[in-house]
Amino acid sequence: MASATSSRRQEDVEAGRRKLEQFRKRKAAEKAKKASQNTQPVDNSQQSVIDSDGAGASISNGPLKQSAESTSNETHTKDVYNLSFSNTAMDDGSKERSRQDDGQESVGKVDFSNSLELIGSSKDLTVNTRPEVVPYSNIDKQSSESFDRASTLRETASLFSGTSMQMDGFIHGSGLTSSRKDSLQPTTRMAGSFDEVAKNQQGSGELGGSIVQKPTLSSSYLFNSPDTSSRPSEPSDFSVNITSSSPLNSAKSEATVKRSRPSFLDSLNISRAPETQYQHPEIQADLVTSSGSQLSGSDGFGPSYISGRRDSNGPSSLTSGASDYPNPFEKFRSSLYPAANGVMPGFTDFSMPKQNDDFTALEQHIEDLTQEKFSLQRDLDASRALAESLASENSSMTDTYNQQRGLVNQLKDDMERLYQQIQAQMGELESVRVEYANAQLECNAADERSQILASEVISLEDKALRLRSNELKLERELEKAQTEMLSYKKKLQSLEKDRQDLQSTIKALQEEKKVLQTMVQKASSGGKSTDLSKNSTSRKNVSTSTEGLAISDTTPESSNQETDSTTLLESDSSNTAIIPETRQLTLEGFSLSVPADQMRVIHNINTLIAELAIEKEELVQALSSELSRSAHVQELNKELSRKLEAQTQRLELVTAQKMAIDNVSPEKQQPDTHVVQERTPIADEGDEVVERVLGWIMKMFPGGPSKRRTSKLL
């Protein structure tokens, strides 16, 4: 924010500077245009400034102008006098214009030598007409006091020797100020009359043919404002050698700029002008001789006098008539006034009206310069107001900057504190991340354990299913065995009935045998055949009466009876013999015969009893094998029941743990890490498996303790 404000202020300052530069350029262009309209082209004009002791100085006055036909560098091939002015302009970049509080302005120092030498030369002379730039620079006020405020313009004509014109050496008092670096362009000129001195105050000098006997050097410094950006200041090509028997005020003079200056006409002492119109040339010659000035030619002719003629258009040219004279200086020689003591005589053709016209023009020019000074003063005031506003703006910006800087420092402190807090939070976050990673690892381990337990539960479920299927198979086999046992029992019962019938028959037969034995014994004693018929009928009744006897259920009795019957049959068979021819029972001990049909019945009964005994043995063997098989199945069933009970107890324990975990409060659902690791996680698949297994157990044991415990848990 502060940088944006400062950049905006800088842009405003740059815009003001650009406007000021444009204004300065415009003023410089207007002044250059006005100077070009009021200035006449000259070659080299010279004025003589006479010091109080009579010393003469050659100083350039105003910008040096060439004629319309000459270029910036013009080479003259004719013999002319080399008028040199030594003025080294200061560096444009090292000297700046300083504006004082009282409105004064200082200019750069100008060095002058103490002698004037006009040296003739027959060689080519290159005249550099570039205007010399002397920028405004800082000059001490104390050093400016050593310089004469008013330079004495002394006319070298013989009419007013000793008469001085007081004028301000610089036209700064009239207000000629420039916003840019101004240039001081000194030019020298040789004026033929005092009128031309005033007329050509801008520095446009004429070297007249009638005035070269006594050169007049006018000194005025006009300030021009060339575009310093396009042409920097350069040393002047003119040099002035001032030799005087009495020294000047100082070898190095300094000028002081005044806020106000006296009128130019008042400083020229116009009342003494008539006295200067008729001065004798010898007086002037003596004056010049006593002052120590020397005009000498450098072509070997010795001291000579300058003569010339005025052109028809007014300004004189140094190059006119150069080839008509064998001596280069003869063209400037005047036939009216011979040389006396090496000094050229002067002319006395000054005219007062022309001088007044020139002074009027000069005064108008000074008024213009005064107006320009006022305009520049207004510009200066505006610039000062702008500078004050910029200064106040700068102070406000400085205050704002200080405030912003304080805020920025506070923000930096806040940022540092926040950065430290962020670092602390980052440390906590890192610890939380480590804990989260540990918890993630624990969760992964718990998931793995739960998967392992789920696989174990699934394997147990498969085992339980296989056990259940085996149990069902055994139950079916047991039922089949029981049905077979029942069928065998029924067969045994039927066989027992048949056996009992046979036993009863055997008993009846034994009784009949006894009866028959008794009858045989009686027959042997009585021998009657009628008794045999009676015995047969009685035997038949006995056989029929023995058919309804009860059959004993006990196996040992039947076996005993069987053994008894077999023994009886053996005894009977041994004691009796059946004779098939007679079909009569014959007893060994008795001599009676048994009918054949009876013997056949007895034989059939014996075979039937034998078959029944064999079948009984087979049934006993099958029953014993089935009993052993049933015992083995019962033992296997007991073992499977024991295993199922163990698995049921384990499943009940797992179910109880699951229900206990589900019944834990939400605050206790975040146990310690070690507790989580020690506790066996329960997989989600185990619930369904446990429910299915419990259902099977309830079906298998409808009234057992498992149902009671499971109902309590559920």
UniProtKB/Swiss-Prot annotation:
Residues 8-33, 92-102 have a biased composition (Basic and acidic residues). It is found in: Nucleus; Cytoplasm. Residues 562-576 have a biased composition (Low complexity). Residues 356-525 form a coiled coil. GO terms for biological process: cotyledon morphogenesis; flower development; leaf morphogenesis; positive regulation of cell division; regulation of DNA-templated transcription; regulation of growth; seed development; trichome branching. Residues 36-50, 58-74, 219-253, 288-297, 313-322, 519-561 have a biased composition (Polar residues). GO terms for cellular component: cytoplasm; nucleus. Residues 1-113, 219-261, 288-325, 519-576 are annotated as: Disordered. Keywords: Coiled coil, Cytoplasm, Developmental protein, Growth regulation, Nucleus, Stress response. Disruption phenotype: Pleiotropic phenotype with defects in cotyledon, leaf, flower and seed development, slow growth, severe epidermal defects, including loss of cell adhesion, outgrowth of cells and increased cotyledon cell size. Its main location: nucleus. InterPro entries: BLISTER (IPR044194). Is required for normal leaf, flower and seed development and controls cotyledon and leaf patterning by inhibiting premature differentiation. Regulates the expression of a subset of PcG target genes. Is required for the repression of the floral specific genes PI, SEP2, and SEP3, but also for the activation of FLC. Involved in response to cold. Involved in the regulation of COR15A, COR15B, BAM3 and AMY3 transcripts, and ascorbate levels in response to prolonged chilling temperatures. Interacts with CLF. PANTHER family: PROTEIN BLISTER. This is Protein BLISTER. It comes from Arabidopsis thaliana (Mouse-ear cress). The gene is BLI.
